[in-house]
Curated annotation (Swiss-Prot):
Pathway: Protein modification; protein ubiquitination. Belongs to the TRIM/RBCC family. This is E3 ubiquitin-protein ligase TRIM56. It comes from Mus musculus (Mouse). The gene is Trim56. The keyword Zinc applies. A zinc finger (B box-type) spans 98-149, 164-205. Residues 372-381 have a biased composition (Basic and acidic residues).
Length: 734
């Protein structure tokens, strides 16, 4: 992999968001650089000062604030120089909108200068035509570069202006920095040189940069090398997880096919094995997600520091490079010497084992075994230790094959399998359709001899048999031949028996589908409307779009519309169980409208004491007429009655630190909550207790967006790619 990264250009630095503060999102004002090399406005950093510490908003590193305050953080001369160049290209006279000459008031006694037509790149002054013609007629200004103002504003002379730009001494305004005091590592102007530093050895800026730049470049190369290693580790982690998912899906299919051929008395064992598979994948996902988060955070921190250092080295002036040299050196050395992540996790893969006594009802016919994946050919030569371990595993596998052929070994129970070392499961005997096959041996896929291997993932076999479980029913795409763009599903609702209505905001249409994916046409929406959330009433459809609530007939005729608050980017819509009222979330409260368009009620969940403390992004209703909402301000799921009284509110660890997503309620009152960031749908009981995961990536979830419940028993889930999955909710007592 090529680790060489191209240097940024001046145009990229001026046109990108590099000069924007990541806190206030405005152009940097009085930029201050933290030790992690992230730059923010001085006033913005002052707002983050808590107890003498500042947490960097980008890398989350905690930085102690100097005793003098945030103003004592290092001033970023590099960013200041770029900001000066940007400001110089902006319109000058705020009243007339036209730039004026900077010299006319000085030489002619006028209160204001004439219209500027040129600019001196050395003086950084706008000049009128007369002043521009005579500007280079003196000895001091003979070598100055005067350019056309229009071309300067267009950016034609950015590179030349940057080269002629001089960093100003903060102690002596108007004096350029031109020396580096070696003992003090401080930039000096001529006046500073004759002051306290007169006896100190000093170097001109150009000479100082030549002596120190190679050291910075060497540190930067080291960080680039670590970035390549981080990227390779991240890719290997994702590949290992993809392999595990593929194998788990394959084994799941085998389990389903085997269970269909046996008696109903084996269903309990079938569910147990599927639960083991889900536990295995979920355990692997959880562990991998934590490692990926750490890897991506390290990668982001290293990239940001390297990008900053690269910009300074390629675009900075001598004074700027030297002013930041200490901070950059410290940060790059810190990143280069920091401990990096270990190699990719060695995981065990499940395999299905069928016992010979298939007709024995007292025998566990379905059981999972776990083995490490076979090493890829390109890694076969890496490290003798891994090959030796594979040979040992092969020998163990041969012994187990012999035992299996003798028929004297009984399959391990799940409890016994828990205590067994997964590394010793290589080459175990597996019987499929009464055909013995010796499984592949593992040679340490992704193992690095220079690092400690990550612990092997063990599946959590402690299933909860009382949870409702999903039964996959249908899956279908929502993109139709007439769509100009890929669908973006922002709303779902039931629309008649076993039919759904899909709000495709990207294509500005409401689509009708049966649960098995048959396209039923559309419900017309007003021209220019992009439906966001949707709900079906009796012979009418309500949807929100562009801060308005619409009620239309099935043929698209507008019955009424209501304006909503502009403080909320989207408004969730839900139909009441009676079918003649619709609820909509508006700026933290809920408004309920009758079918004739009159306002029935308005309430804030929790009453007036919660005013301004709620942000209901998703909303639904229960069969009993209660409301369930995802509150992004409180990061919770709130359950309230029709008067707004909060019955319960869930903020537990089951949210995995994510913002709660779409919510749906089945006929028994169970709440199905979408957690998009972790590819999960979790289930809560009617009292607000978290029961566990209902859907995960094992079930094909990839960035789920919105859900709805049809006929009280079908959970419909839309994905970010426009695909819809339909699952039937099966309870243990059904």
């Amino acid at each position: 992999m090529n680790s060489k990264v191209s240097s940024p250009t001046l145009l990229e630095a001026l046109s990108s968001d590099f000069l924007a503060c990541k806190i206030c999102l405005e152009q940097l004002h009085t930029p201050k650089t933290l030790p992690c090399l992230h730059t923010y406005c001085q006033d913005c950093l002052a707002q983050l000062d808590i107890g003498g510490q500042v947490r960097c908003p980008e890398c989350r590193e905690i930085v102690p604030v100097p005793a003098e305050g945030v103003a004592a953080f290092k001033t970023n001369f590099f960013v200041n120089g770029l900001l000066d160049l940007v400001k110089a290209r902006a319109p000058g006279d705020v009243h007339s909108g036209k730039p004026t000459c900077a010299l006319c008031p000085l030489v002619g006694g006028k209160s204001s200068g004439g219209p500027a037509t040129a600019r001196c790149l050395d003086c950084a002054d706008d000049l009128c035509q007369a002043c521009a013609d005579g500007h280079r007629c003196s000895r001091q200004t003979h070598k100055h570069r005067v350019v056309d103002l229009v071309g300067y504003r267009a950016g034609w002379y950015d590179e030349e202006a940057r080269e002629r730009q001089a960093s100003q001494c903060p102690q002596h305004p108007g004096e350029a920095l031109c020396f580096l005091c070696q003992p003090c590592s401080q930039l000096l102007c001529k006046d500073c040189r004759l002051g306290p530093h007169i006896d100190h050895p000093c170097l001109p800026l150009a000479e100082a940069v030549r002596s120190r730049k190679p050291g910075l470049e060497e540190l930067l190369a080291g960080v680039d090398s670590n970035l390549v290693e981080l990227e390779a580790t991240r890719v290997a982690e994702k590949e290992a997880l993809a392999l595990l998912r593929e194998q788990a899906a394959s084994v799941g299919t085998q389990v389903e096919e085997a269970a269909e051929r046996i008696l109903k008395s084996l269903l309990a064992q079938k569910q147990e094995v599927l639960g083991q598979l889900r536990a295995l994948v979920e355990a692997a996902e959880e562990a991998t997600r934590e490692r990926l988060t750490k890897i991506e955070r390290q990668e982001q921190v290293a990239k940001a520091a390297a990008a900053f250092a690269r910009r300074v080295l390629s675009l900075g002036l001598e004074a700027e490079i030297l002013s930041l040299e200490g901070a950059i050196t410290q940060r790059l050395r810190q990143l280069q010497d920091a401990p990096w992540t270990s190699g990719p996790t060695r995981c065990v893969l499940p395999q299905l084992e069928l016992h010979p006594g298939l007709e024995d009802k007292n025998c566990h016919l379905l059981r999972l075994i776990f083995e490490e994946p076979k090493q890829s050919p390109k890694d076969s030569g890496k490290g003798g230790a891994g090959t030796q371990g594979g040979d040992e595993a092969q020998g163990q596998g041969d012994d187990r094959t012999k035992i299996g052929k003798q028929g004297g070994a009984q399959p391990l129970t799940p409890k016994e399998g828990k205590d067994q070392n997964p590394q010793e499961d290589d080459g175990v005997f597996i019987e499929r359709g009464n055909r013995p096959n010796k499984k592949k041996k593992c040679k340490g896929r992704g193992k690095s001899v220079s690092r400690e291997p990550s612990p092997i993932l063990r599946p959590n076999l402690e299933g909860s048999g009382l949870l409702p479980r999903p039964v996959f029913s249908w899956s279908f795409p929502t993109r139709m031949p007439g769509d100009k763009r890929s669908p973006r599903i922002t709303g779902l609702c039931p629309y008649g028996p076993q039919e759904i209505l899909v709000a495709d905001e990207q294509n500005r249409v409401l689509k009708r589908f049966s649960l098995n994916g048959d396209y039923k046409g559309t419900v017309q929406v007003p021209e220019g409307c992009s439906p966001c959330s949707v709900a079906a009433l009796q012979n009418a459809v309500a949807f929100s779009a562009n801060a308005k609530l619409y009620l239309v007939s099935p043929d698209g005729e507008i019955q009424w519309r209501r304006s909503l608050s502009l403080t909320q980017s989207s408004h969730a819509v839900a139909a009441m169980p009676c079918g003649d009222r619709v609820a909509v979330s508006v700026a933290g409260h809920v408004e309920v409208y009758k079918k004739d368009g009159s306002l029935a009620t308005r309430f804030i969940p929790g009453g007036k004491a919660s005013r301004g403390q709620r942000a209901l992004v998703f909303l639904t209703t229960s069969p009993q007429g209660n409301f369930v909402g995802s509150d992004w301000q409180q990061n919770s799921v709130v359950f309230c009655d029709g008067l707004g009284q909060v019955i319960w509110e869930y903020k537990g660890p089951g949210l995995h630190g994510c913002q709660p997503g779409s919510v749906s309620v089945d006929k028994k009152g169970y709440i199905f909550l979408t957690l998009r960031e972790v590819n999960k749908v979790v289930i809560l009981d009617p009292k607000g207790s978290l029961l566990g995961d209902f859907l995960t990536a094992y079930h094909g979830l990839e960035k789920p967006r919105v859900t709805t419940m049809v006929d009280g028993k079908y959970l419909v889930v839309s994905l970010s790619n426009g695909t819809i999955h339909v699952f039937r909710v099966r309870f243990p007592d059904s």
